Amino acid sequence: MNSQDLKKRQEKIRNFSIIAHIDHGKSTLADRILEKTETVSSREMQAQLLDSMDLERERGITIKLNAIELNYTAKDGETYIFHLIDTPGHVDFTYEVSRSLAACEGAILVVDAAQGIEAQTLANVYLALDNDLEILPVINKIDLPAADPERVRHEVEDVIGLDASEAVLASAKAGIGIEEILEQIVEKVPAPTGDVDAPLQALIFDSVYDAYRGVILQVRIVNGIVKPGDKIQMMSNGKTFDVTEVGIFTPKAVGRDFLATGDVGYVAASIKTVADTRVGDTVTLANNPAKEALHGYKQMNPMVFAGIYPIESNKYNDLREALEKLQLNDASLQFEPETSQALGFGFRCGFLGLLHMDVIQERLEREFNIDLIMTAPSVVYHVHTTDEDMIEVSNPSEFPDPTRVAFIEEPYVKAQIMVPQEFVGAVMELSQRKRGDFVTMDYIDDNRVNVIYQIPLAEIVFDFFDKLKSSTRGYASFDYDMSEYRRSQLVKMDILLNGDKVDALSFIVHKEFAYERGKIIVEKLKKIIPRQQFEVPIQAAIGQKIVARSDIKALRKNVLAKCYGGDVSRKRKLLEKQKAGKKRMKAIGSVEVPQEAFLSVLSMDDRCQEITKPNRLVFRGELLWAYMTKKLIIS
C-alpha cells in the first residue's frame, strides 16, 4: 500500500472500548458484536469469548483487557475496521481500563436498565473523559421485567452529565439494538489522528510472554508504520530488536504484512528478557527514531501488600520467574524479596486490591503450578520517628521500636457507596464502625442514595466489602479512590508463642481496638494450634506490654496408672520427674503452627466458616483466598 492508500484506510478505522460496572453486560455485548460482524463463526462462538482465562470464565468477570479487530460493512456501503478493546469492570482492575482507553478514540458506556448507574460506572466514565473519548451511552437489558430505560436515561443525564437522548436501548442477551450501536460507532467515534509518513511511534499497552517467541508486545500505532524485518528501538532504554512478525487479534493472532497509524495489534521481535520492555513505553524505528516518546501511563501505586512464600523452599527461583512473567502481563503488580523466620524466603507483593491479590495467587498456582502460603494483607503506613525521619512501612515486621516512633500516618480512601434509601442507616453505621468520617450524601433519584465517606484503607482491606454486601442484602455498589494520609493512634501488635515472636502473625491495629483484637486472636490460636507435650503460652503484646494471654494446656501421660496404692512418696516422685521433663521440653521444644493460624489474624470474628472445597475459606460467601494446610515449625 502507498501512503495515500494508507491514509484512506486510516479514515475507516474506529478504535473503541466497552466500559461498565460489573455485571452490566459488557462481555455479552462484545460477544454480540463479534457475532453481528461475523468475526467469529457460529461454531467457534461461546459465551465470554474474549475472557480467555479459565479464571475469568469461572468467576464471570473480566480480568485482562483484550484487543480484537473486526470488519463491519455499514449502511453507507463502506467497510470499516473496528478495533474493540474489552475492559474489566472491577475497581481493582482500573489500571487495565485506563490502559485500554488510552488506545481508543471512543467508548461505549453500558448501563443496566434495571440497576441504573452504579459506583464503577462513574469511575469508568471519568477515566474516559480524562482521555477525551467520545462516549456512546447504551442502556442494556431492556428485556428485563424490572427494566426502566427512561429512569436510567434521566440518571445518565443528571448524574454523569451526558446527553442520553440518543442512547441506544439494547439487550445484548437477546441481540436487540446491536446494529444501531455499530452504526453509532461509525458516525460518532472519530477516526484516529496521526501521520503515517511520520517516524514510528507505537504505545505498548500490554504484553505477554511466549515460551517460543519471547515477549510479544500489544501496541497501538500512533504515528508511522511497522513491518517484519524492521529494527525497532525502545525509547525508555534504547534497546533494539529485529521484528519477526506483526499482526492482529481476531481473537486469534493473525499475521499481517504491516501495522500502520491507527492500528491495534501485536509485534513479535524475539525479546527474550522480561526486563527489556514495560507497559507504557514507546516503540520507534532504530534507523529513523521519533524525537520524543509518547505520554505513557501514570504508574499505579499498590494499595495492599502481602507476603507470598513457596511451600517448598526449593521453588523460590520458580516463584521469582513466575512473578516476573505475571508482571509483564500485569504492570500494576509489584514485588521484592523478603525473609520471614517462620516462612523462609519469599516476596513482599503489592496489589491494587483484595480481588487483584486473589487473582494473582490463583494464577501463580494454576499457570505455574506453585503451591503458596500468603500472609494477611496490610497497607503502607508512614511512620515518623523521633529523629524526624519518615519511613514507609508495608510489613509489620519492619516497624521500628515503639520508643523511636513519634507518630504514625495511615492512608484514607474516599469511599463512594450507592445504595437504596432503606439501607442508608446500615451503611452509615458500618462506615462509622470502621472509623469512617462522613463527607456528603446525594439522592440520585427517589430511592437511590450516593453516600461518601473517608475511611482508613486498612479497614477496607479486611472485610468492609463483605460486610457492606451483607448489611445491604447485596444491593450496594462500592468504589474508592486514594484520598490522603492522616495521623492515627496505631500500634504494632506482636503474637508470642512460648515466649518467641512469630513475625508472620504480627499486625497493625488502632489503639482503641488493640485489647479486643489481641484477646480474639489469642483465643483463636488456642483453638487452632494443636496441644503439645508441654504448656504453650500464647501472648499478644504491644512493645514490652502483654495485653492478652491464653495458655494451651500440655498433653499429659498418666504416670500413676501402674501405681495400685503404695506409698504416696512414690507417686510424688513420678509426678516430680514428669514435671521436670515437661520443664526441660518447654525450654528446648518447638510449636507446630497450622496454616489456619495466619488466617485468624485476618478474620476477626466468628463468621468465618469452612466450605466443602478443601483448603479454602469463605467470609460471608465471598472467597478470600486459598491457604495451604502445611504446618510450620516455630522454634
UniProtKB/Swiss-Prot annotation:
Subcellular location: Cell membrane
Binding-site positions, GTP: D23, H24, G25, K26, S27, T28, N140, K141, I142, D143
CDD domains xrefs: EF4_II (cd03699), EF4_III (cd16260), LepA (cd01890), lepA_C (cd03709)
EC number(s) on file: 3.6.5.n1
Transmembrane stretches, start-end: none
Catalytic activity line of the entry: GTP + H2O = GDP + phosphate + H(+)
Family that this chain belongs to: Belongs to the TRAFAC class translation factor GTPase superfamily. Classic translation factor GTPase family. LepA subfamily.
PANTHER family named among the record's database cross-references: TRANSLATION FACTOR GUF1 HOMOLOG, CHLOROPLASTIC, TRANSLATION FACTOR GUF1-RELATED
Protein name, per record: Elongation factor 4
Species name: Streptococcus pyogenes serotype M12 (strain MGAS2096)
Native organism taxonomy: Bacteria, Bacillati, Bacillota, Bacilli, Lactobacillales
